[in-house]
From Swiss-Prot:
The gene is gpgS. It catalyses: an NDP-alpha-D-glucose + (2R)-3-phosphoglycerate = (2R)-2-O-(alpha-D-glucopyranosyl)-3-phospho-glycerate + a ribonucleoside 5'-diphosphate + H(+); (2R)-3-phosphoglycerate + UDP-alpha-D-glucose = (2R)-2-O-(alpha-D-glucopyranosyl)-3-phospho-glycerate + UDP + H(+); ADP-alpha-D-glucose + (2R)-3-phosphoglycerate = (2R)-2-O-(alpha-D-glucopyranosyl)-3-phospho-glycerate + ADP + H(+). Disulfide bonds: none annotated. Its cofactor is Co(2+); Mg(2+); Mn(2+); Ni(2+). Optimum pH is 7.0 (at 60 degrees Celsius). Optimum temperature is 70 degrees Celsius. Inhibited by ADP and EDTA. It comes from the Bacteria. This is Glucosyl-3-phosphoglycerate synthase. Mn(2+) binds at residues 126, 245. It is an enzyme of class 2 (transferase). Belongs to the glycosyltransferase 2 family. UDP-alpha-D-glucose binds at residues 37-41, 71, 104, 124-125, 216-219, 243-248. InterPro entries: Glyco_trans_2-like, Glycosyltransferase_2, Nucleotide-diphossugar_trans. It comes from Petrotoga mobilis (strain DSM 10674 / SJ95).
Amino acid sequence: MKDNILKRSFHHSKFENIKELVKLKEKQDVKISLAFPSLNEEKTIGKEIIIMKSELMEKYPLLDEIAVIDSGSEDETVSIAKEYGAKVFYSSDILPEYGFYKGKGENLWKSLYALDGDIIVWVDSDIENIHPKFVYGLVGALLNYPEIGYVKAFYDRPIVGKSAMQPTGGGRVTELVARPLFSLFYPELSTIIQPLSGEYAGRREILEKLPFFVGYGVEIAHLIDIAEKFGSEIIAQVDLELRIHDNQPLHSLSKMAFELTKVVLKRLEKYGKLDLNTELTDKHIMIQKKENEKVLVPTEILSVERPPMITIPEYKEKFSKEEKV
């Protein structure tokens, strides 16, 4: 195994001195942006914004901007985000000439254009136990270690039931799909504890050179692309202890597993590790029970890939202008 990312694992408490992080940020003369990709998260988005804004902008000026990148929420997500002082962007309004896909990866890709930071932090908008550590833990690793370019969060993920909480068992797709595939083809990446976690941060000069799958495949593709283009040595991980959120039902996890497997197979072929000799289907076939019989339920799951943002002329023009100012 070429690398062991466990060696670059930190506990969030190592970076809890936010005053020191602000000093490092000012010394390095960098801007830091936080983005929440969202779709119908009215129950949690307000609390997330309040906590991050009050602690990491008003009390300590660690963050330069907080934004919500929305896929077209039909609830009160957008109005709540605006009320509590976040910048709000509809993903469909960012670089509209390139079209719009509904998906988390699309929001992340578009956020690179919308946000100004040299360091970008992405945090999912459905976290029930939100805490400033979800940001300063990730940012702290980047500010303290210039050789690190991309930081993933890890944590315990309990399964929340109607009447009780199982302390472990979340992250099922990681253990059943991602880790076995990494063990086979990228063993160094199998040492990432939560490779599919939705909380991570990176340096713009890394992120802008990565393609983005528009759906759930974005995280796993990032890790493979980073390992191939930059080396896994720039990846670190931070222990945030616990993340509580609504767990996905099994049929949703099945769709996610299909998409992740397809993305990994595409990457294996791209990097010459596998020759598929076949066209991968977009149709995921599930079997469900209706009344007293089993029926096939085919679902189309596209694996659309956005190019590296650095290849987009509008992006290059915007950020070359900012560099000259």
